[in-house]
Amino acid sequence: IKRDVENAKAAPSGASAGAATQPDGLILPQVLDDRVYAPDSYELVPLDGMRKTVAKRLTTSFMQVPHFPLNIDLELDHLLASRAAINAAAREGVKVSVNDMLIKAAAMALMDEPDCNASYTDKGIAYHKHANVSVAVAIEGGLITPVVFSAETKGLAEISEEMKDLATRARERKLKPQEYSGGTFSISNLGMFGIKSFASIINPPE
């Protein structure tokens, strides 16, 4: 205890040793405590710019934005039957996914419920005129959310083709900044891993 007190006295005021205080008030560790983890007991992999940005933005969001997850069970028999019929009649090369249908459904719902398609600001509530749906895409070393802009105006085939293009270029790290910013609502899917439900973190300023 005496050693801890002496170390605390020697540490800079306002932050503990081995930690950095960010402009937004977050205290992030710069190094692991050698008294807990020996330096040769782990391998340190530096973060790239994207991971640093994602970590900071989502940590801030989780701390500052009220989160209240809601869950409901849905019967998707009709949706799956409709998807099969749509794909059977679609032109060659078009294959609509469940995700594509969820993008369209979310966009239509957002236009019907403007309060869900809004962003809070200090000057007031910004009600967005279009449903710009972000879709989480896993890429090497992180996650990115390309946007289907004005999704309420697009058909399923157009959404499907656009989403395939965005996801491909996202994995190749060829997206332009304007293609993964400006969303008003996000969709993240973990169903392929057997996940039935999860509480996601709001992607600000959505």
What residue spans do the PLM features occupy?
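C-terminal catalytic/motor cores of large multi-domain enzyme assemblies
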Residues: I1-E206
